[in-house]
Amino acid sequence: MESNIILVVILGISIVGKATSVAISVAALLILKLLGLDKYIFPYLNDKGMFWGLVLLTAAILIPIAQGNVKAIDIKNNLVSFVGITALVLSFLTTYLSGVGLRYLTVQGHSDVMPSLILGSVAAAAFLGGVPVGPLITSGILALLVKMVKKS
């Protein structure tokens, strides 16, 4: 019962904070619990959910390439530019940090920090126009760095 209350609070905060992806996720979990399907679906989501979520996210990010909107010459030119090199370095760093974070939350057993992470994501979505999605963090950091470099 306590878990339902926590999820409802997170749902409310995510709705108020306009973090739609978080709200949909929480609502789906609550519905699964209410239908009694949690004992069947939660173990699979717990085990494979992150993987399949990343697969879908990666596929969505690769759509411009799949549609032919990004050509090989564009990639080549980008890879040798300041923005491209910075993107590679930041992607390397954030991917490494994501792995460290995932191990911290799962292997090291600090899943209790998840509500704070969700709240931070929701607050950033509500007040800063952010999007609570992992790989997009890299492009956000990149955009800020590029903006700083262009100002100087």
UniProtKB/Swiss-Prot annotation:
Coiled coil: none annotated. It is a multi-pass membrane protein. Keywords: Cell membrane, Membrane, Transmembrane, Transmembrane helix. Pfam families: DUF441 (PF04284). GO terms for cellular component: plasma membrane. Its main location: membrane. It is found in: Cell membrane. The keyword Cell membrane applies. Signal peptide: none annotated. The keyword NAD does not apply. The chain crosses the membrane at residues 5-25, 50-70, 82-102, 117-137. Belongs to the UPF0756 family. HAMAP family: UPF0756. This is UPF0756 membrane protein CA_C0092.
